């Protein structure tokens, strides 16, 4: 397949549109079903790079959930806890394959943002993963292959129009990449940098105890950031990104945004949320919306008289600010990555409130001393990588 003709570009008025190889070679992808769009393919190609690098760095199957050219979640395939099964809506599926676990966690980190996602998988899509994808609202999927049964399940999705893409896992892009803006061609070297253990050796804090589990989480954070629109910050725990702040002009707003997402992920594990008495007829996306409102400042949108009766069997108690603060204090050992240096210690202070213990950032700010002092005040472990990871 040398080119794919698209319905339109970013917007319906941007026609004609297609993707192709400038050198005339075949594309490294094959469309097995559906008709992916321009943004779908941007998500697919960025997401594939992310999961293939996660697999290489950790040795575990990996998945990511992309929306508008940034990941909403990314994870490796470790076993789900019973609570994770509940908050990801998969407790009825029994034991899942490692790849399905990876997608459940990638999708479940920020379910509001992942609605209508494009999925990338590091490994051949199996039946467990296909059954999980079948239940979710999603635009498409890319993987290095599909079992016959998994492919049939996916082909039936969206009335037979679900986009299914197979990628050549051995494809390596040219060393030089190009893109055009306003008719002007930009050229740069492809970002082949690998995130490995050596990148975290320069620990600048008093506490230098970096366990293997935290090292893996920091690698996941930086690999995720490598394919996230800048500025970006990523919180990771237990092999999964739990809060990604993408595309913000200020570093502190990245840290706040990602931190609020990480907080929401942890609040969903609280007894107050796990025991919400949903009506049996409430669908998965509506539950996600209700939970998002319930744990936020607009909780009366679901608890007001005339509202809660449409969602719950009985009216839940308000999840008070004091209760939320007490629950969030239990979230610990979170890892944090940043695609560029923290200019002020306020980023560290905000990260600490979301349970951050381990930090990886390039360093190089004129106020590095202030940032290190803030990290030391909370007994954090912080590595300076010397590596900026801007992505646009």
Model-based region annotation:
Residues 1-199, 214-232:
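Active-site loops and adjacent core secondary-structure elements that bind or stabilize anionic groups
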Residues 117, 121-122, 135-165, 170-172, ...:
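C-terminal binding/interaction regions
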Residues 23-35, 109-115, 189-208, 286-307, ...:
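Gly-rich Lys/Arg/Thr-decorated short loops/hinges at beta-loop-alpha junctions or inter-strand turns
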Residues 53, 227, 264-268, 353, ...:
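Conserved helix-loop functional segments at active or binding sites
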Residues 57-65, 164-167, 230-237, 267-279, ...:
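Flexible, glycine/charged-enriched surface loops at secondary-structure junctions
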Residues 70, 125, 237-240, 342, ...:
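Active-site-proximal loop/turn and secondary-structure-junction residues that shape catalytic pockets
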């Amino acid at each position: 397949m040398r080119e794919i003709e698209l319905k339109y570009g970013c917007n319906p008025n941007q026609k004609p549109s297609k993707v192709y190889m400038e050198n005339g070679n075949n594309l490294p992808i094959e469309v097995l079903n559906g008709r992916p769009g321009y943004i779908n393919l941007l998500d697919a190609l960025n997401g594939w790079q992310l999961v293939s690098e996660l697999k290489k760095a950790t040795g575990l199957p990996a998945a990511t959930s992309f929306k508008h050219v940034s990941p909403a979640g990314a994870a490796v395939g470790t076993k789900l806890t019973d609570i994770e099964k509940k908050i990801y809506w998969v407790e009825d599926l029994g034991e899942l394959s490692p790849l399905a676990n990876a997608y459940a966690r990638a999708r479940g980190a920020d379910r509001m943002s992942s609605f209508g996602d494009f999925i990338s998988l590091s490994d051949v899509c199996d039946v467990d993963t296909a059954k999980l994808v079948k239940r979710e609202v999603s635009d498409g999927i890319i993987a290095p292959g599909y079992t016959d049964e998994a492919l049939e399940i996916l082909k039936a999705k969206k009335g037979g129009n679900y986009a299914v893409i197979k990628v050549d896992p051995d494809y390596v892009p040219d060393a030089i990449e190009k893109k055009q803006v306003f008719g002007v061609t930009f050229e740069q070297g492809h970002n082949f940098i690998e995130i490995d253990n050596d990148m975290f050796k320069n620990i600048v804090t008093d506490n230098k105890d970096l366990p293997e589990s935290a090292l893996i989480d920091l690698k996941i954070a930086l690999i995720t950031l490598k394919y996230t629109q800048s500025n970006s910050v990523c919180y990771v725990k237990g092999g999964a990104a739990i809060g990604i702040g993408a595309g913000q002009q200020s570093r502190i707003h990245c840290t706040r945004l990602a931190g609020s997402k990480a907080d929401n992920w942890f609040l969903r594990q609280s007894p107050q949320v796990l025991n919400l008495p949903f009506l049996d007829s409430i669908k998965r996306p509506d539950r996600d919306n209700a939970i998002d409102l319930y744990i936020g400042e607009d909780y009366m949108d679901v608890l007001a008289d005339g509202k809660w009766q449409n969602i719950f069997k009985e009216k839940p108690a308000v999840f008070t600010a004091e209760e939320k603060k007490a629950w969030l204090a239990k979230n610990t050992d979170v890892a944090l990555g940043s695609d560029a240096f923290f200019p002020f210690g306020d980023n560290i202070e905000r990260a600490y409130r979301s349970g951050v213990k381990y930090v990886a950032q390039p360093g190089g700010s004129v106020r590095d001393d202030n940032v290190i002092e803030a990290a030391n005040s909370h007994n954090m472990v912080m590595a300076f990588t010397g590596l900026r990871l801007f992505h646009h």
